[in-house]
Every structure is written in C-alpha cells, then in structure tokens.
Amino acid sequence: MSTTPTLSHLDESGQIRMVDVGHKTDTDRVAIARGSVRMNATAYGLLTQPGQGKGEVLNTARVAAVLAAKRCAELIPLCHSLPLAFVGIDFELDEAAHSVHIRATCRTQYKTGVEMEAMTACSVAALTIYDMCKAADKGIVIEQIRLQYKAGGKSGEWRND
C-alpha cells in the first residue's frame, strides 16, 4: 500500500509547523547539491585569468558557501539547526559553456537530513560568484540548483543523476 505524499511542514489544518524530529535516532546523513553560474566570454575570461579572479572569486564563494550552510536554519524558517560534521565546496570550470559548476557536500550525524544546508551552500556560492563578476556581465545566469544525492535516515539513499 503506497502513501499519498504530503507537505511535511503543514499540519492537518494547513498551518505551518516545524517537523518534530525529537523521537528520531541520530544517523549518518549526507547531501550533495549542484548548480551552475553561466556568464559571457568576457566575464569568464576575467574569472579564469591567472593571477586575476579565479583564486579570489572561487575562494570567496567557497567561504561564503560554508558560512551559508552553517547558518541555514537562520535563513530557512522551518529548517532545524543541526551539527554539521563537514561542508565541502568544489568548482569545475567549463570553458565551452563559460560556466562554473558548483558541487556542495554536507554531512552530519543527526535526526534530520542536510539537504537544505547543501542547497543553501550551493546557492550562496553561486550568488557570490554572481556578485563578484556582475561588473563584467549584468546577464549572468544562475541555473540548475538541485539536490543531486542524499543518504541516511528513514528514506535511505536517493539520486538525481
């Protein structure tokens, strides 16, 4: 017998609520989010020019992403505060598409997952790249921010390849 999907942050009367995770057992959890920042050739050239933008822009975006993951519960109203064990941010430069591909990985051992932390980290990394490159391209596009993988807890492993 299958269960009908529900919105977990709404009660029976449709009012918002924080999900009660007090009864759950701490388990190892991991989530990976991905996204991309696409820009024009000029901005991409400045970003990737040796001794120019790449190091500073991407390092700033990495630090911003880690901070965002740590503060996720302050930004997303019904998100639980949780102890992050790890936040990792990786960038892949895509010259053909003038894009930076972002991968945010978060881990914890807790009662609830780290999907929101990974998604927030990825989003803020993308926004930071946008902020630092917008002078060279007002038309920068942040795209495809999504959960790619999660594991742990009752729902187990999930992939979005």
UniProtKB/Swiss-Prot annotation:
Substrate binds at residues 78-80, 116-117. Pathway: Cofactor biosynthesis; molybdopterin biosynthesis. Gene3D superfamilies: Molybdopterin cofactor biosynthesis C (MoaC) domain. Its EC number is 4.6.1.17. Homohexamer; trimer of dimers. NCBIfam families: moaC, PRK09364.1. Belongs to the MoaC family. This is Cyclic pyranopterin monophosphate synthase. It comes from Bordetella pertussis (strain Tohama I / ATCC BAA-589 / NCTC 13251).
